[in-house]
């Protein structure tokens, strides 16, 4: 009898459970969910432009358990600049660490600590653009387009010591921009490869300007020029002798206008070969390359400047003969192309 009563009760409870689940399932589920989630919450991270309040997409953040110092989740902001974690235990401390941000914003390296105290928690992380970016706009795709740059490159003149040393003076200005304690004369005398002019069988013999500086940059009459490669080598030798690996030198011959603007937007000044009078190259001089029978024709109005920024239709530069100057962009890049598209960077 007891067995029959027990089985009847069990059957009734089972039937009642099935009935409640079928008729009140949503409420039961909600009650269970509330019970399970009552000690959990989410963290919403908002990534914004510190100056203009633009939401920043594609910002990545690590959520770190402060007690264990373990990364428990990585989140990325959507196009509206918002990212939300999964459920996290309440009453715990967490660190929020930004690991990636859309260019040209600077990474926010602060580690933000907070305690998760409610079901919905929110923190705003701000990012700045570098100070050399003077203006920018937001595109329809929510990217940032830099419209004005001015790099703080100091004016260094080649004269009077280096009447024909615009190339190495331009390099000196770039190294000064990065904080190196060198100067145009040290670079010219100690590091720049040079080949003096000589005469053989009544023929003028000199350097391949892709391999070494032709002549002596200290001389008004015996100095001429080089292209980018010897100046790249000058910087590489300087870094090697001084055991410096913090910067790299790169030949960027053939770069487009867009390529160069992008470099400037990243804070990288560009050493560019143009002409001294901003007119088309006058290729009206020649000599034989030392050690060969090859004769080369070279421009007599070659000049080298440092591009430092841009705005609207203008490009800013440091001219080793004049100091800071402004060029009309279309004209400058036309001359640059005619002069062979020679350029280099240190970054």
Residue ranges and their predicted role:
Residues 286-299, 305-347:
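Noncatalytic regulatory segments and standalone regulatory/sensor domains
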Residues 256-260:
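Surface-exposed ligand/attachment interfaces on beta-rich extracellular proteins
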Residues 2-138:
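Solvent-exposed loop/turn and edge beta-strand elements of beta-rich ligand-binding domains
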Residues 178-188, 243-254:
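Surface-exposed patches in mature extracellular/periplasmic domains of secreted proteins
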Residues 22, 28-32, 58, 70, ...:
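Active-site-adjacent structural segments surrounding the nucleophilic cysteine of cysteine proteases
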């Amino acid at each position: 009898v007891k067995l029959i009563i027990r089985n009847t009760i069990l059957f009734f409870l089972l039937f009642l459970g099935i009935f409640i689940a079928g008729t009140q399932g949503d409420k039961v589920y909600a009650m269970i969910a509330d019970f399970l989630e009552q000690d959990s919450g989410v963290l919403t991270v908002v990534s914004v432009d510190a100056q203009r309040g633009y939401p920043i997409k594609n910002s990545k953040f690590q959520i770190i358990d402060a007690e264990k110092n373990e990364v428990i989740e990585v989140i990325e902001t959507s196009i509206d600049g918002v990212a939300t974690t999964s459920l996290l235990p309440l009453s715990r401390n967490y660190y929020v660490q930004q690991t990636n941000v859309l260019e040209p914003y600077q990474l926010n390296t602060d580690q933000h600590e907070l305690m998760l105290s409610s079901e919905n928690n929110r923190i705003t992380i701000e990012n700045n653009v570098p100070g050399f970016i003077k203006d920018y706009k937001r595109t329809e795709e929510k990217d940032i387009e830099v419209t004005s740059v001015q790099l703080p490159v100091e004016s260094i003149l080649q004269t009077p010591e280096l009447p024909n040393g615009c190339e190495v003076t331009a390099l000196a200005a770039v190294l000064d921009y990065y904080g190196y304690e060198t100067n145009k004369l040290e670079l010219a005398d100690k590091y720049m490869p040079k080949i003096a002019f000589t005469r053989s069988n009544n023929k003028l013999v000199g350097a391949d300007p892709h391999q070494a500086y032709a002549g002596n940059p200290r001389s008004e009459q015996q100095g001429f020029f080089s292209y980018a490669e010897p100046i790249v080598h000058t910087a590489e030798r300087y870094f090697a002798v001084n055991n410096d690996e913090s910067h790299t030198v790169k030949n960027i011959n053939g770069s487009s206008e867009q390529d160069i603007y992008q470099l400037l937007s990243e804070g990288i000044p560009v050493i560019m070969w143009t002409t001294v009078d901003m007119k088309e190259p006058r290729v009206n001089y020649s000599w034989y390359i030392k050690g060969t029978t090859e004769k080369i024709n070279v421009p007599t109005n070659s000049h080298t400047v440092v591009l430092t920024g841009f705005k609207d239709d203008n490009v800013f530069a440091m001219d080793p003969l004049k100091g800071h100057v402004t060029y009309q962009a279309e004209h400058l890049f036309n001359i640059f192309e005619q002069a062979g598209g020679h350029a280099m960077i240190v970054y």
